[in-house]
C-alpha cells in the first residue's frame, strides 16, 4: 500500500517514525509529512493532494482535525482510501474511514498489535463478530457485482439470518452454517459469469475473480469503437463479466494496434504479446485458418495466445466482422474460511 503519515507535533512525529519503520518492514511504501514544517499550505488543500494519491492516510493527532481535513474529498467506501487516526502517545489506533474496502480495520489491528495500542473499530460486523462479505471479497481480490446487495447481505447476517454461498472454485475450510441456507432470498456466487442474475424470488450477489485471458485478433487499423462494440457483444453472448478480464493476448504484429490497446486500458487488463513462434508452441486443438497463417505465420492467434496464459479453455474462436476472440481462465483459485 502507498501510505502517508501526517503528524502535527514533535511527539506525534516521533510516533510517526515508529509507524513508518513498522510499515516499511511490511513492504508498504510510506511517506512521512510533518505539518510543523509544512504549515504554509492550508490543511484541506494539503490533505486533498494526499487523499487522492494514497491507499491509506494515518493522522497522528486529534480526530477532529483528520475529519475536517478529509471531509471535502469523501466519495464512498469503494473509492476512498483507508484513513486512520492515532493519538500522539500511541494509545489508540482509530479506523476512521474505509474500514473494509480500504483496509483501515485490518491496518488498525496490525498497528495496534505491534505498537501495544488499542484498535478502535466501530464497524457493525466487526463489533458483532459477523462475517463481512465486502471485507472477504477484498481479501480474496473479488469484485462485488452489486454494492447495495452486499450491504443487504451484511444487514441480514447482523440480524441473525443466513444466506446461501456457492463457489465455482475450491473452498478451503468449512463454510459457516450462516452461508449454507439454500432457501434464503439472497445467494452469493463466486463466479466470472453473468448467467446468475437476480429475480423477484432470488437476489444474486456475484463475487467476481479476475481470472480470464481473452485472446484477440483483428484487421489492421480496426476502429476503437468497432472493437469495443464487438467485445461487448462477445461478453454478452458468452455470459462473461467484463470485471473478470485479467489480460488480453495477441501476436506481436498487433502489439501497437490502437483498438487492442484501448480495450486493455478500458478493462484495466494486462496485454500479453507473443511471437508466431511462441504461438506455435501452444498445446491444444485450435481452429486454424490458412488465411490467418499467410498473414501472421501461425494458423490461429486468439485461441493460441489465450492458451499460453491459462490452459483451461473457456470459449473457442468467434468472429465479429473481422475481429476474433477466444478465452481461457485460471480454474485453480482457492478461497478460505478459517
Language-model segments: what does each one mean?
Residues 322-332, 338:
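Hydrophobic, glycine-enriched assembly/anchoring segments
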Residues 8:
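Glycine-rich Rossmann-fold phosphate-binding loop(s) that bind the pyrophosphate
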Residues 31-33, 120, 270-274:
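General small-molecule cofactor/ligand-binding pocket signal
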Residues 1-5:
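Extreme N-terminal starter segment of soluble prokaryotic enzymes
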Residues 31-34, 38-46, 103-106, 289-291, ...:
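Secondary-structure junction/capping motif
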Residues 12-28, 36-42, 49-56, 60-105, ...:
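Conserved mixed alpha/beta catalytic, RNA-binding, or beta-rich assembly cores of soluble enzyme
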Residues 232, 249-306, 310-313, 319-323:
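C-terminal non-catalytic interaction/assembly regions of soluble proteins
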Residues 29-31, 177-178, 311-314:
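Short secondary-structure junctions
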Amino acid at each position: 500500500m502507498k501510505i502517508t503519515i501526517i503528524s502535527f507535533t514533535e511527539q506525534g512525529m516521533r510516533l510517526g517514525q515508529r509507524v513508518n519503520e513498522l510499515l516499511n518492514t511490511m513492504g508498504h511504501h510510506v511517506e512521512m509529512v510533518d505539518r510543523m514544517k509544512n504549515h504554509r499550505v492550508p490543511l484541506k488543500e494539503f490533505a486533498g493532494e494526499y487523499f487522492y494519491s494514497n491507499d491509506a492516510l494515518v493522522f497522528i493527532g486529534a480526530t477532529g482535525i483528520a475529519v475536517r481535513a478529509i471531509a471535502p474529498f469523501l466519495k464512498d467506501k469503494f473509492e476512498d482510501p483507508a484513513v486512520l487516526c492515532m493519538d500522539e502517545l500511541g494509545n489508540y489506533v482509530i479506523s476512521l474511514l474505509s474500514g473494509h474496502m480500504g483496509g483501515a480495520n485490518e491496518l488498525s489491528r496490525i498497528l495496534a498489535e505491534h505498537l501495544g495500542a488499542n484498535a478502535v473499530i466501530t464497524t457493525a460486523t466487526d463489533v458483532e463478530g459477523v462475517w463481512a462479505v465486502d471485507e472477504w471479497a477484498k481479501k480474496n481480490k473479488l469484485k462485488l457485482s452489486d454494492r447495495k446487495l452486499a450491504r443487504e447481505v451484511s444487514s441480514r447476517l447482523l440480524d441473525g439470518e443466513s444466506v446461501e454461498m456457492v463457489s465455482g472454485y475450491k473452498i478451503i475450510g468449512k463454510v459457516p452454517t450462516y452461508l449454507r441456507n439454500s432457501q434464503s432470498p439472497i445467494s452469493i456466487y463466486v463466479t466470472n459469469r453473468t448467467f446468475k442474475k437476480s429475480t423477484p424470488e432470488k437476489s444474486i450477489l456475484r463475487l467476481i475473480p479476475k481470472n480470464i485471458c481473452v485472446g484477440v485478433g483483428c484487421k489492421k487499423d480496426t476502429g476503437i469503437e468497432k472493437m469495443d462494440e464487438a467485445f461487448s457483444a462477445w461478453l454478452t453472448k458468452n455470459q462473461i463479466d467484463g470485471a473478470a478480464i485479467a489480460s488480453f493476448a495477441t501476436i506481436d504484429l498487433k502489439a501497437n494496434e490502437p483498438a487492442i490497446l484501448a480495450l486493455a486500458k478500458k478493462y484495466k487488463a494486462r496485454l500479453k504479446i507473443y511471437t508466431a513462434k511462441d504461438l506455435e508452441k501452444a498445446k491444444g486443438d485450435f481452429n486454424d485458418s490458412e488465411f490467418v497463417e499467410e498473414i501472421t505465420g501461425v494458423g490461429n492467434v486468439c485461441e493460441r495466445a489465450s492458451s499460453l496464459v491459462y490452459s483451461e479453455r473457456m470459449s473457442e474462436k468467434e468472429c465479429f466482422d473481422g475481429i476474433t476472440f477466444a478465452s481461457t481462465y485460471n480454474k485453480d483459485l482457492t478461497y478460505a474460511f478459517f
